[in-house]
Amino acid sequence: APRSSFEDTVKKTAAEAAQKSDRPTSSQGIKLTPLEREIDVDQIQYEHINIHLDRNLGAAHIMIQGPAKLPPDDVSAINPMGDRFWPLALARQIDDAILHLRLNETEIGTWVFHTQGDGNMVAAYDNLLLENASDWLVREIILYLKRTLKRLDVSSRSLVTLIEPGSCFTGTLLELVLAADRSFMLDGLFEDQPESVSAFLRPTSMNFGPLPMVNGIT
């Protein structure tokens, strides 16, 4: 297209592509608000992620919090939740954290992943997404999770996961274990936390197809 009509051509092409979408014309998109992120000398805090930087060891300890409440019963409730919907919020925050550590913390060569929360709640969110995968918004959220995990997979850092009592490496979060170069699982409980739930891993259907690596293998 000539430069004089380039902008109009782009708009026309985008409109034609949008018409092919299966998203109902009455549906509204979600506004992605700026991420809430606080950066300190050795700490980065998001809503669902806390990162502690151990500069002496060149390691970033990345603690991911599982969902605080169960997902809605109906897929129609996801849109009103906007970017606060846990899987979408988590994907955005992990994506941002990966890029921040890659670009701004080049001396941090090891990323150590921890999780904390209720694995049953993580599984419930996975089930909601999978049962409604044909919904346009759910599909986009799953694709966002897939892209984010691919970005992690190709990051030139040593990836470690620590599977500890009270962790929730279930379904989508189990992908962190599968992507890691090394994983360590504690057998038993910490002496000062006898009330904790023993460490466990729990796959869901999210681990068997929807989230392939860059090579196409799950």
Model-based region annotation:
Residues 2-157:
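Intrinsically disordered, low-complexity segments enriched in small/flexible residues
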Residues 1-28, 134-218:
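Conserved catalytic cores of soluble enzyme domains
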